[in-house]
């Protein structure tokens, strides 16, 4: 079994662009 490489530096999480699904689907505005 190939060994998994351990990341030496902390992995940065990829930020997803903010998508407001709630507004699109429900059409309800959040206060």
UniProtKB/Swiss-Prot annotation:
Residues 1-31 are annotated as: Disordered. Keywords: Chromosome, Developmental protein, Differentiation, DNA condensation, DNA-binding, Nucleosome core, Nucleus, Spermatogenesis. One of its GO terms (cellular component) is nucleosome. The keyword DNA-binding applies. The keyword Ribonucleoprotein does not apply. Testis. It comes from the Eukaryota. It is found in: Nucleus; Chromosome. Protamines substitute for histones in the chromatin of sperm during the haploid phase of spermatogenesis. They compact sperm DNA into a highly condensed, stable and inactive complex. This is Protamine CIII.
